[in-house]
Regions:
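Structural signature of beta-strand start/N-cap positions in the alpha/beta core
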Residues: 7, 31, 50-52, 80
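Conserved phosphotransfer microenvironments
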Residues: 56-72
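Two-component/phosphorelay signaling modules centered on CheY-like receiver
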Residues: 15-33
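As written
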Residues: 71, 93-102, 106
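Conserved phosphotransfer cores of two-component systems
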Residues: 46-49, 71-79
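Acidic, metal-coordinating helix/loop segments flanking the phosphotransfer/catalytic sites
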Residues: 34-53
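Hydrophobic/aromatic residues positioned on beta-strands within the core alpha/beta folds
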Residues: 83-85
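Non-catalytic signal-transmission and effector/linker regions of two-component phosphorelay proteins
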Residues: 1-15, 22, 42, 70, ...
Length: 121
C-alpha cells in the first residue's frame, strides 16, 4: 500500500471496466479520478494537473488516445502514462506511453503494472 495518497486519472469509455479498475486501485489505497472520454480527461487535467499516473484506454480511442498521450507529455513532460489496449500494440521507443498493458492479461496484472510504474517514480 502506498504511504501517501497517490493520484491516478483513469480514462476509459466503458463504464463497467472503468468502475471495476477504479475500485481495484482504490482498494490498493490509491486516490482515483475517472473520465469517460478524452474531452472530460482534458478538463480534469486542466483543473488538477498533478497526477502520479494517467491511465488511458487506447482500444476505445484509437488514434486520438495516442494523440492525447502526446498532448499530456508536451504539457507535463514528466507525467507517467500507462495505456490499456484490447490486444497487443507495438509502439516504437520514442512513442508516448511509458507502458502499454493488454486488457487480456487480466486485472491482477493490471494492478501489478500500475504498482511497478508508481514504484519507479
Amino acid at each position: 500500500m502506498p504511504r501517501h495518497k497517490t493520484r491516478i486519472l483513469l480514462v476509459d469509455g466503458d463504464s463497467t471496466v472503468q468502475h471495476l479498475r477504479a475500485l481495484m486501485l482504490r482498494m490498493q489505497g490509491y486516490d482515483v479520478d475517472t473520465a469517460a472520454d478524452l474531452e472530460s480527461a482534458r478538463t480534469v487535467i486542466a483543473a488538477a494537473p498533478h497526477y502520479n499516473l494517467v491511465i488511458v484506454d487506447v482500444g476505445l480511442f484509437a488514434g486520438p488516445g495516442l494523440e492525447f498521450c502526446e498532448e499530456i507529455k508536451q504539457r507535463h513532460p514528466h507525467q507517467k502514462v500507462l495505456m490499456q489496449v484490447d490486444g497487443h500494440l507495438y509502439l516504437g521507443r520514442e512513442s508516448c506511453p511509458d507502458k502499454v498493458v493488454s486488457k487480456q492479461d487480466g486485472p491482477q496484472h493490471f494492478v501489478y503494472e500500475v504498482q511497478r510504474m508508481l514504484e519507479a517514480t
